Amino acid sequence: EHLITAEVMVASFAQAPSQATVARLKEAGVVVIPTIGARRHAEKVAEWGVDAVIAQGTEGGGHTGVVPTSLLIPQVLDAVDLPVIAAGGFVDGRGLAAALAWGADGIAMGTRFLLTADSSVPDNVKAEYLATPSTGTVVTTAIDGAPQRVIATDMVRRLEAARLTRFPRAAANALRFRRLTGTSLRALLAEGIRMKKAQDLTWGQVALAANAPMLTRATMVEGRTEVGILPTGQGVGSIDELPSVADLVSRIVAEATEALDRLCGG
C-alpha cells in the first residue's frame, strides 16, 4: 500500500511476492518485476501476471539460486512469454552483449551500480568491496536460512560457526526490525506465515528471516562492516573504480555495441 500511495511506477522484488500482492499492484497500475532464480519460479510468477522477470544466476549477490546465469537465462526464455532481464555477474558491456546473444532483453546490475560515485553506500563499505577478489565471496545459509552470496567476512564466519546462538540473534533482530518499521507483532507473524507458504520455507528459515535486513542495514546504511553483511555478486572482483552512473551506463552501451559489431563482422 505504501508503494501505491507513493505512486511508485515499478516494483521489483528480491524474492517473489504473494499472488495477492501482485494482483493489488497490477490493479493500481504498477509494473511488477520480481527476481527469480529457477525456471519453476518464473513459470509461477508468469501465471500471476507479472510484467517481466529478472532471472538471476548463482553468480549474483544476496539471495541466489544454484543455476549459473548462462544456463538459467535460456531455461527461463523457453519457459515464459515475458521480457527477461538477465542478472548475476554482469559488470560491463561485454556481459550485456552476451545476455542479448542468449535472448535476454537486457541486464540488471546490483554490485556494479553499488560501486559508483553516486551510490549512497558509505565510503568505507565501498572500500571493502573494491578490495574483494572474485574468489572472496561465499554462499551461506547462516544469515536467514536461505542461500545468500556475500563477501566472506569475519562476521559471516562467526554466523556460520555460532549455530547455537543463531535463533536468539534472529529474535533480537526481529524486534529491532519491528521497531524500525513500525510493524506490529501480529503483522510480523502474518508475514512469516505468508513467506513460509509462498516460498516453501521451513519454520527455521522463517524464524531467521529478520536477520538479513538488519545485518544489511548495519553495513549499507550505518557503515558498520564489522557487525553486518556485504551482499555481493562474483563480478565484484572485476571492479576497481567508482565512476558516475552516467559514465558507467554510457561506457557499457559503447562496449556492448563494439562487441556486437565484432560478432556481426563489423
Residue ranges of model-derived segments:
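Alpha/beta enzyme core
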Residues: 1-85, 92-111, 182-186, 191
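Conserved active-site-proximal phosphate/metal-binding subdomains
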Residues: 69-81, 91-266
